[in-house]
Design a protein with these regions (language model features):
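Core catalytic region of metal-dependent phosphoesterases/phosphodiesterases
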Residues: 2-5, 9, 14-114
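Conserved catalytic motifs of the protein kinase core domain
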Residues: 5, 43, 117, 200, ...
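Residue-level detector of flexible, active-site-proximal loop/helix-junction positions
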Residues: 13, 112, 228, 240, ...
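Active-site environment of divalent metal-dependent phosphoester hydrolases
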Residues: 15-17, 52-55, 85-95, 127-129, ...
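Conserved beta-sheet core of the metallophosphoesterase superfamily
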Residues: 104-107, 120, 125, 131-139, ...
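Structural motif
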Residues: 114-115, 237
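Active-site-proximal loop/helix segment associated with metal-binding centers of metalloenzymes
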Residues: 124-185
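C-terminal regulatory/interaction regions
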Residues: 248-258
Length: 258
């Protein structure tokens, strides 16, 4: 990989103001991280919930995020592939980002191989057994008829409503989350998957709890954390996965490695 790294981040929730800063301040911070990452990145994976709410019409998209869009376009134009994954907050990405920014858009988990190591990469929501209420909600959100009906609403109302719902959903739950180990549904999903196929790493967002957790058969589960409370990301350096906390203008803090 010629000393280049693969970068992973998720759950940035752009557009969401928090106790640690305005939405614009967090966007600027993430753009600063992108500036650092592009120096030695071979690829960048943004693994879902990039936006706190996103819904694009055929000819209308939400305003804002100008700095973020500009930097992503610049990185793609420089020859570094950038991958966007839909999450549960931005499931309504369609063709705007591939056409305008040149990113690769993924609606489902993908499998990639880096230096002979197989990676299973996705946002992580709705995988495995259980959580049937959320799975039903996701089916509703991805239903093409219901999407068409929602698109009949004027953007002034639909985007206001979507943002209000998203913020309410976020603050109705704990933003921070403590990972529960093998009892987590996502860990159970990964271990069950390993019964049928070998992987070295499962890389997910969604849980907002940065951790590298050991699985069966020497595999690892990497949960990327978030950019609301933790400001974390992961890199694959060709040998190991590194989970780090971004600290602007300082050396980033290594949280875990494996």
């Amino acid at each position: 990989m010629n000393n280049q790294k693969v970068y992973f981040a998720s759950d940035i929730h752009l557009g969401l103001p928090t106790q640690k800063g305005s939405a614009l301040a967090r966007e600027k911070l993430f753009v600063k991280w992108l500036d650092e990452a592009k120096k030695d990145a071979s690829e960048i994976f943004l693994v879902g919930d990039i936006f706190d709410f996103w819904y694009e019409y055929k000819r209308v998209v939400p305003k804002g995020f100008t700095r973020f869009f500009g930097r992503i376009a610049e990185i793609v134009d420089s020859g570094i592939p950038v991958h966007f994954f839909t999450g549960n907050h931005d499931v309504w990405m369609f063709d705007y980002f591939p056409k305008e920014l040149g990113v690769e858009l993924h609606r489902k988990p993908i499998v990639r191989v880096f230096n002979g190591k197989k990676f299973f990469i996705g946002h992580g929501d709705g995988l495995g057994k259980g959580d049937y209420g959320y799975k039903l909600l996701k089916l509703i959100f991805t239903n093409r008829v219901l999407q068409w009906l929602f698109s009949r609403l004027h953007p002034n109302f639909s985007l206001w409503f979507g943002n209000r719902w998203s913020v309410s959903s976020r603050y109705s739950k704990y933003i921070t989350y403590k990972f529960k180990g093998d009892s987590e549904l996502i860990a159970q999903f990964a271990n069950t998957t390993l019964d049928d196929e070998m992987y070295s790493y499962f890389v997910f967002g969604h849980w907002h709890a940065p951790v590298i957790h050991p699985l069966k058969n020497s595999a690892k589960l990497v949960v990327l954390g978030d950019w609301i409370e933790n400001f974390t990301y992961a890199t694959w350096d060709g040998e190991l996965m590194n989970l780090l906390r971004y600290i602007p203008n300082e050396n980033d803090e290594l949280l875990a490695q494996g």
